[in-house]
Amino acid sequence: MAGVSVRDVAAQDFINAYASFLQRQGKLEVPGYVDIVKTSSGNEMPPQDAEGWFYKRAASVARHIYMRKQVGVGKLNKLYGGAKSRGVRPYKHIDASGSINRKVLQALEKIGIVEISPKGGRRISENGQRDLDRIAAQTLEEDE
């Protein structure tokens, strides 16, 4: 399908399809500690999907950067952060782990999906945009 972009596909469908693509491809460098680490200091437990959550985070980050022109680690920390349960006190927003988001960006940069932006942060590369559009077209075909 010509002219299909990531914007034409539902977010959850695209993220699942791209995460499985990254997992099948096997080029994404996954840190050894992903099965035991929490994704935020506000979380009580690590993710339940011990093997696949890093790929889903990478797919989600790639889509997020595609939708916006450039994104830094700080913005991703805010995006993936959440509410911390503080007992009887009111909830409070806690940022996500910067280390995990930094490792995701470095892994995506290593396989050529994102590149460092001269203005700061990361932006999608030409090869990354082509790959994401191709996966989006395949996802749209499967849905129809």
From Swiss-Prot:
Drop me one GO molecular function for this one.
RNA binding
Matches recorded under Pfam families: Ribosomal_S19e (PF01090)
Location within or outside the cell: Cytoplasm
PROSITE patterns recorded: RIBOSOMAL_S19E
* Listed GO CC annotations: cytosol; cytosolic small ribosomal subunit
Entry annotated with the keyword Ribonucleoprotein: yes
Under InterPro entries, the record lists: Ribosomal_eS19, Ribosomal_eS19_CS, WH-like_DNA-bd_sf, WH_DNA-bd_sf
Primary location recorded for the protein, binned into one broad class: cytoplasm
* GO biological process: one example: ribosomal subunit export from nucleus
- What keywords sit in the KW lines? Cytoplasm, Ribonucleoprotein, Ribosomal protein, Ribosome biogenesis
Q: What happens when the gene is disrupted?
A: Disruption of a single RPS19 gene reduces cell growth; a double disruption is lethal. Depletion experiments show the proteins are required for correct maturation of precursor rRNA to generate the 18S small rRNA. A specific site between the 18S and 5.8S precursors (site A2 in ETS1) is not cleaved in disruption mutants. Partially assembled ribosomes are retained in the nucleolus rather than being exported to the cytoplasm. All effects are exacerbated in the double disruption. Increases association of NOC4 with 20/21S pre-rRNA, decreases association of ENP1, TSR1 and RIO2 with 20/21S pre-rRNA.
* Gene3D superfamilies for this protein: Winged helix-like DNA-binding domain superfamily/Winged helix DNA-binding domain
The miscellaneous annotation reads: Present with 3440 molecules/cell in log phase SD medium. There are 2 genes for eS19 in yeast.
Q: How does it assemble?
A: Component of the small ribosomal subunit (SSU). Mature yeast ribosomes consist of a small (40S) and a large (60S) subunit. The 40S small subunit contains 1 molecule of ribosomal RNA (18S rRNA) and 33 different proteins (encoded by 57 genes). The large 60S subunit contains 3 rRNA molecules (25S, 5.8S and 5S rRNA) and 46 different proteins (encoded by 81 genes).
The free-text function statement in the UniProt record for this protein reads: Component of the ribosome, a large ribonucleoprotein complex responsible for the synthesis of proteins in the cell. The small ribosomal subunit (SSU) binds messenger RNAs (mRNAs) and translates the encoded message by selecting cognate aminoacyl-transfer RNA (tRNA) molecules. The large subunit (LSU) contains the ribosomal catalytic site termed the peptidyl transferase center (PTC), which catalyzes the formation of peptide bonds, thereby polymerizing the amino acids delivered by tRNAs into a polypeptide chain.
Q: Which family does it belong to?
A: Belongs to the eukaryotic ribosomal protein eS19 family.
* Name recorded for this polypeptide: Small ribosomal subunit protein eS19B
Q: What is the lineage of its organism?
A: Eukaryota, Fungi, Dikarya, Ascomycota, Saccharomycotina
